[in-house]
Amino acid sequence: MSVIPQETDEALSPEAIEAARKIFAGPIAFLKSAPSLKFLPDMEAPEVAFAGRSNVGKSSLLNALTGRNSLARTSNTPGRTQELNFFDVGEDPVLFRLVDMPGYGFAKAPKDVVLRWRFLINDFLRGRTVLKRTLVLVDARHGIKDVDRDVMKMLDEAAVSYRIVLTKADKIKPTELEQTLAATIAEARTRPAAYPDVIAISSDTGQGIAELRALVIEAVS
């Protein structure tokens, strides 16, 4: 778990962005999948987790951040990722880990699958002392939904700091994006564990990717 967020002015300096680029250009490898807590890797390195509704673009974002085309599998099937997937960044030593959390909000999932997801995520958030930040991905075309609020409530209650990231920012008009950003920032500022700033990104165009890399590095530093 992590402390309540505080802003760092230097996080998005040109120097920080370049340093983050170099780290993400280095060795990155899939470590393991964990369908339950007993399969979690040892807590040997700080972690940043990625959460979001099914098909919000988590896998595409992970690939864009790391500059790989197939680090994380992308799928047109909502809810495909039903495990916690861990990726090592750096080697000898591992600098930190990225955690791809199971997508949520899949409408046709059986109730037992939904309950299993909730127990897995809740226990992971509350017991993972090396988890430094969670990035909650929200589709810019739709804004924050109730299922997102459920996850943010879990993060608030677990005292895990998180930042909201608007994905697919290139899919809507700039004026619509501004409105969605304003509404999202306003809601983030009502949440005890959320950063008050929101970043909009596009995995397709690269918008915001360099800045998000720097924010990830800030979280684990």
Feature annotation, model-predicted:
Residues 87, 167, 212:
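Residue-level signal for inorganic ion chemistry
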Residues 43, 156-163, 213-221:
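Extended low-complexity acidic/polar segments
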Residues 93, 119-196:
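Conserved C-terminal guanine-recognition region of P-loop GTPase G domains, centered on the G4
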Residues 25-37, 171-221:
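Canonical P-loop GTPase G-domain recognition
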Residues 40-45, 80-86, 102-132, 140-154:
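Switch II of P-loop NTPase G domains
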Residues 2-108, 221:
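Conserved G1/Walker A P-loop phosphate-binding module
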Residues 61, 134-135, 212:
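Hydrophobic packing within well-folded, soluble alpha/beta domains
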